[in-house]
């Protein structure tokens, strides 16, 4: 049985590629190093079902990655996997560097300013150029917080809290 609590999403299968079962992979981190060294991955389908697959070597292409799976040799088989997230067990991933976090560990954190103003809950993260953007929602507002050292004061995963020092005008938008 697959323990869904220990899984970390590392990418999403966004489209088929060719007729031989290859898929286009959007990597959440922009890297596929961990996928290249593992002997199995878990695919979480759009309906939440979890299935184990053995990946074929990942192929880098301009602006994307291509991946295939053993037993998936035709476009019709691959099409059923489009929209699935590729997940790895936490023990298949490297430990994050100091002041680095996996996105899944940040989602759900309470976010406040260092002065104590509660902003809401970190609900989404997306890449924007050289930094990530944290989407924080609360009290009928949405804040887009850049994940840069000048703004992120501290992250306490055990307490479930992030403190920020907002740049001038950041909270006025």
Curated annotation (Swiss-Prot):
Name of a matching Pfam family: PRC_RimM
Keywords assigned by UniProt, alphabetized: Chaperone, Cytoplasm, Ribosome biogenesis, rRNA processing
Annotated localization: Cytoplasm
Residue ranges of domain PRC barrel in the record: 98-170
Transmembrane feature ranges: none
GO BP, one annotated term: rRNA processing
Gene3D superfamilies, sorted: PRC-barrel domain (2.30.30.240), RimM (2.40.30.60)
Gene Ontology MF term list: ribosome binding
SUPFAM superfamilies membership: PRC-barrel domain, Translation proteins
The keyword Nucleotide-binding is annotated on this UniProt entry: no
Gene Ontology CC terms, in alphabetical order: cytoplasm; ribosome
Family: Belongs to the RimM family.
Domain notes: The PRC barrel domain binds ribosomal protein uS19.
PANTHER family for this protein: RIBOSOME MATURATION FACTOR RIMM (PTHR33692:SF1)
Function: An accessory protein needed during the final step in the assembly of 30S ribosomal subunit, possibly for assembly of the head region. Essential for efficient processing of 16S rRNA. May be needed both before and after RbfA during the maturation of 16S rRNA. It has affinity for free ribosomal 30S subunits but not for 70S ribosomes.
Quaternary assembly: Binds ribosomal protein uS19.
Protein name (Swiss-Prot/TrEMBL): Ribosome maturation factor RimM
Organism: Pelobacter propionicus (strain DSM 2379 / NBRC 103807 / OttBd1)
């Amino acid at each position: 049985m697959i323990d869904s609590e220990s899984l970390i999403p590392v990418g999403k299968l966004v489209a088929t590629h060719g007729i031989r079962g290859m898929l286009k992979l959007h990597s959440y981190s922009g890297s596929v190093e961990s996928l290249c060294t593992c002997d199995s991955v878990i695919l979480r389908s759009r309906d939440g079902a979890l299935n184990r697959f053995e990946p074929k070597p990942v192929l880098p292409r301009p602006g994307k990655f291509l991946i295939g799976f053993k037993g998936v040799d035709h476009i019709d088989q691959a099409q059923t996997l489009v929209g699935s997230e590729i997940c790895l067990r936490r023990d298949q991933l490297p430990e994050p560097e100091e002041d680095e976090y996996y996105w899944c560990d940040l989602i759900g954190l309470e976010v406040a300013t260092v002065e104590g103003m509660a902003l809401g809950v970190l609900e989404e993260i997306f890449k924007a150029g050289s930094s990530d953007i944290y989407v924080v929602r609360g009290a009928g507002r949405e804040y887009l917080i850049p994940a840069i050292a000048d703004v992120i004061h501290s992250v306490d995963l055990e307490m479930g809290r992030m403190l920020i020092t907002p740049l001038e005008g950041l909270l006025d938008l």
